[in-house]
From Swiss-Prot:
It catalyses: estrone 3-sulfate(out) = estrone 3-sulfate(in); L-thyroxine(out) = L-thyroxine(in); 3,3',5-triiodo-L-thyronine(out) = 3,3',5-triiodo-L-thyronine(in); chenodeoxycholate(out) = chenodeoxycholate(in). Residues 495-549 form the Kazal-like domain. The lineage of its organism: Eukaryota, Metazoa, Chordata, Craniata, Vertebrata. Disulfide bonds join C501-C530, C507-C526, C516-C547. One of its GO terms (cellular component) is basolateral plasma membrane. Residues 25-38 have a biased composition (Polar residues). Residues 127-145, 198-224, 296-311, 400-419, 472-580, 639-672 are extracellular. One of its GO terms (biological process) is spermatogenesis. It comes from Pongo abelii (Sumatran orangutan). Residues 24-71 are annotated as: Disordered. Coiled coil: none annotated. This is Solute carrier organic anion transporter family member 4C1. Mediates the transport of organic anions such as steroids (estrone 3-sulfate, chenodeoxycholate, glycocholate) and thyroid hormones (3,3',5-triiodo-L-thyronine (T3), L-thyroxine (T4)), in the kidney. Capable of transporting cAMP and pharmacological substances such as digoxin, ouabain and methotrexate. Transport is independent of sodium, chloride ion, and ATP. Transport activity is stimulated by an acidic extracellular environment due to increased substrate affinity to the transporter. The driving force for this transport activity is currently not known. InterPro entries: Kazal_dom, Kazal_dom_sf, MFS_dom, MFS_trans_sf, OATP.
Amino acid sequence: MKSAKGIENLAFVPSSPDILRRLSASPSQVEVSALSSDPQRENSQPQELQKPQEPQKSPEPSLPSAPPNVSEEKLRSLSLSDFEEGPYGWRNFHPQCLQRCNTPGGFLLHYCLLAVTQGIVVNGLVNISISTIEKRYEMKSSLTGLISSSYDISFCLLSLFVSFFGERGHKPRWLAFAAFMIGLGALVFSLPQFFSGEYKLGSLFEDTCVTTRNSTSCTSSTSSLSNYLYVFILGQLLLGAGGTPLYTLGTAFLDDSVPTHKSSLYIGTGYAMSILGPAIGYVLGGQLLTIYVDVAMGESTDITEDDPRWLGAWWIGFLLSWIFAWSLIIPFSCFPKHLPGTAEIQAGKTSQAHQSNSNADAKFGKSIKDFPAALKNLMKNAVFMCLVLSTSSEALITTGFATFLPKFIENQFGLTSSFAATLGGAVLIPGAALGQILGGFLVSKFKMTCKNTMKFALFTSGVALTLSFVFIYAKCGNEPFAGVSESYNGTGELGNLIAPCNANCNCLRSYYYPVCGDGVQYFSPCFAGCSNSVAHRKPKVYYNCSCIERKTETTSTAETFGFEAKAGKCETHCAKLPIFLCIFFIVIIFTFMAGTPITVSILRCVNHRQRSLALGIQFMVLRLLGTIPGPIIFGFTIDSTCILWDINDCGIKGACRIYDNIKMAHMLVAISVTCKVITMFFNGFAIFLYKPPPSATDLSFHKENAVVTNVLAEQDLNKIVKEG
């Protein structure tokens, strides 16, 4: 119902516990006296507001006898339009049983479900599938790094516009749009599985030494698999469009709906759930990788998960996420523009904005014409920009490790892809979630100010920097590999898989099937010079190998059998995996403990009306300088440590087969330490520059609160009069 006093929503205006105190004075007097307390604002108001107020003759409340003047009407309508509270439902459908969802806790639950779904896909399933996608579609790590960065490119391009226009719009419905785009992106990402045909194992070729072998032809279908790169990029772009409203408008909506001291706890919980998503994604993806990629062919194939040619069903998780994401569209669209009680909560908040950015016009940012000025205003806030650069440096390494940690563990410690992904998820996800929750809890528990939250983040980053040298503490040496790091019993040259012992075998470089013999790994049984095999044994064993001198004997209940090589990689002798996992787990905790405090600091150091835009700028810069180049830099860095590339029948270089473990460890620790130092520098500089607003500066924020309080008083008074 709309009147001269504004918009009334009597059913959903929360009754104030101090209503009698607020009704003891005229509402108009409350507003005018609050506005006139600031000399600068007083000079800018119409003449009617500058007239001295006559003393009240009666303390009894009375309704205004005349319509408010133009200035008061504008201020009142502005405040009411900002806090349109309503019931939970769709159009005229508002069941009473669903109104329990119409609370900050109810919204947080739905927010967490969407954040979990987004985390499952973007930071869980995508990361755990990278190694499989590399092999299936013959891509380099730099190309799969581009796939990971495509999400951030989309986020970066849209964040400013979504955050600016969404701040004035219906935020929950923006999140319904986010759920739709996340589901669509997950669906598109799975499409290459259905159009790329059946996975070819290459079993038509003999894996043993054959002196007469037919030459293989180069088919265009093999080399064209990498063209599916563009489909993966499209899926990531759609996922980025869905993630943009979630972490800008969703975070601002949570901050709107709860008191200041609870904001960090709610935001920390939401961010922790966004990290729980990757945990589920890693576990789910790890289990799905134990299913053969072509599910219908799984029972008929004779290879096992230990076979290097094995590829898991990476695509199933994306289809499940598509269904779950779309199931959240309707629940989000049922939320009102603001939750009941938001206006009263906002009336009790105090500004902590950086002094140079505290005196923004209350009506600023309501028009598209204000966008350039709003952007310039935030870019001139030195504290805000330092915090943004700090998070960008941190995001570079966190995104890089989230993408390539399973690959690092797989190659450093000689594990299977699925087990390495499970271990990576077991370290990354619980550590990140625990860090987010601890950070938010400590900020809320001790009610830290803006400056104290920045100091807390600086401390946690320092601890993480100290422990980042774990890659040097727990690195593993390179395992012996014939023709790469080890010669063929003193013959042949390093860097050449062909030696005198296998020169007549006509081995195929495109057929990678490692075997282990005498503690040395060989590219395939053919390159080991093996001419015979026993297929019924698991694992498959080979004998009459010209490149292997010493035989290995195995005894079973039925027979004693001598062989020279067995299928699979050699067992690693490095026992530093537990040390690495424990120390890296602590590094992750302290790294993510700074996440919530920095977000809270950003929300506090800018003007109240520019928080969504501030988050949009943060995520744009964070992705431009952090999460977009992060996986690409890590991909090129890891590729630079490759010592044996896969080359197909057409002579095209594919995925890397063998890495230099020592060089990889040193390169990764160099990136980590550099980024940590940059993070701490900008964080410390923000602390040095920050100037909390003096008490007089807070008046501009309290003037808005006075108007909101006045509106609440009038609504409560009208309700009493109508009920009477």
